[in-house]
Curated annotation (Swiss-Prot):
Active site (record annotation): C11 (cysteine persulfide intermediate)
Membership in a protein family: Belongs to the sulfur carrier protein TusA family.
Record-given protein name: Putative sulfur carrier protein AF_0188
A Pfam family recorded for this sequence: TusA
Taxonomy, superkingdom: Archaea
SUPFAM superfamilies membership: SirA-like
Length: 77
């Protein structure tokens, strides 16, 4: 599983990094995105949907860290 660590980064950087990871991934790959910017809770799911990918898991971890698990279901250009 590829991990995108956006802890300590604020909008729009987590979205930029998540998008780049999705663009560089192959169909079928799983990406874990970690962020602690509260805006990411809404921004990342919107990005995933916009790019046609699948958000398979979301959870709030300790210390305000948000964890998103995304499955790449189609190529992103």
């Amino acid at each position: 599983m590829k991990q995108v660590d956006c802890i300590g980064l604020y909008c729009p950087e987590p979205v930029f990094r998540a998008r780049k990871a999705m663009e560089e991934s192959e169909v079928g790959e799983i990406i874990e995105i970690l962020a602690d910017d509260p805006a990411a809770e809404s921004d990342i799911p919107v990005l995933v949907k916009k790019l046609g990918q699948e958000l398979v898991e979301f959870e709030k971890l300790e210390d305000g860290v948000l964890r998103f698990v995304v499955k790449i279901v189609k190529e992103v250009r």
